[in-house]
UniProtKB/Swiss-Prot annotation:
Promotes the exchange of GDP for GTP in EF-1-alpha/GDP, thus allowing the regeneration of EF-1-alpha/GTP that could then be used to form the ternary complex EF-1-alpha/GTP/AAtRNA. Signal peptide: none annotated. It holds the Pfam family EF1_GNE. InterPro entries: eEF-1beta-like_sf, EF1B_bsu/dsu_GNE, Transl_elong_EF1B/ribsomal_bS6, Transl_elong_EF1B_B_arc. This is Elongation factor 1-beta. Coiled coil: none annotated. Belongs to the EF-1-beta/EF-1-delta family. Disulfide bonds: none annotated.
Length: 88
């Protein structure tokens, strides 16, 4: 069984969102068998900063869909999109 690394852009609802708190909440909703291998922060515009975690998922779990859904359901998340994926 292989693993897939996915860089996922998580846009907060506003610049006022506490990114440290949002990061903790994202880590808390990870589906079983997945892990986060670091976070980056990307300045978007007008003070808005996106979180970009690199998520490692088992190849046999159907990809990143479960992670995307879990992240999208976190309070203060406006949108979730896959930036890149690759096999490990």
């Amino acid at each position: 069984m292989g693993k897939v690394a996915a860089k996922i852009k998580v846009m907060p609802e506003s610049p006022e969102v506490d990114l440290d708190d949002l990061q903790e909440r994202l880590e808390g909703v990870l589906p079983e068998g997945t892990k986060i291998n670091g976070f980056e922060r990307e300045d978007v515009a007008f003070g808005l900063v996106a979180l970009t975690p690199t998520v490692i998922v088992p190849d046999d779990t159907g990809g990143t869909e479960a992670v995307e859904e879990a992240f999208a359901n976190v309070d203060d998340v406006e949108s979730v999109s896959i930036e890149s994926t690759g096999r490990l």
